[in-house]
């Protein structure tokens, strides 16, 4: 016999800490406590509200409200999707117009090397970022199954056609070779760390969608938008 104290921030429900939390409710010799950040009188409530806007409701519930968030909780919701009207080298939201020449343009790359029907797609997503509003406009998306020799020519064309400043590629496994070949072709590459699972890496993007700062084009020529929304 003895005593034990278990302290942790909740992280999903498929783990020993959640099971311990649930089981302890009905054990006479156990006590359980939950202390959300707001319970700390030394922390400014305005700072907490600011964190909620920055992190999004899902991460905020876990990190600040000490809630167990189900791993199957949908992190992208359809009513978060917003749209802009493409103009002549501009993006329009209502009466506001954002000039492409004034924005920072880049792309992220999710690589897959195979043309088999069962293989994943290589996805290259181009963005334009307005620093004044922090709005992020999705301007283009390439999605197809590619063999390794076709990746660099495709990436190079997108890099120059969309006037990108850089492309982000994860530095992991065979992708390191892709990074090196891309740099040799004059493509500016920002190496991204793959140090988290895909869901964790998607949470900052989820927060920006929820805050209404990511926009898809409202354009019938952008046939990839529907597929992108379904993938999310």
Task: List PLM regions with ranges.
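ASCE P-loop NTPase helicase motor core
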Residues: 1-51
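ATPase catalytic-site recognition across NTP-hydrolyzing enzymes
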Residues: 37-111
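Conserved beta-strand scaffold positions in the cores of enzyme catalytic domains, especially
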Residues: 4, 32-35, 106, 189-191, ...
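Mg2+-dependent endonuclease catalytic cores in nucleic-acid-processing enzymes, primarily RNase H-like
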Residues: 67, 71, 75, 123-125, ...
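Short, conserved catalytic or adaptor-binding loops enriched in Gly and charged residues
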Residues: 20-28, 96-98, 182-183, 207-208
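An active-site-proximal beta-strand-loop segment
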Residues: 109-124
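Short amphipathic alpha-helical segments
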Residues: 17-20, 120, 179-182
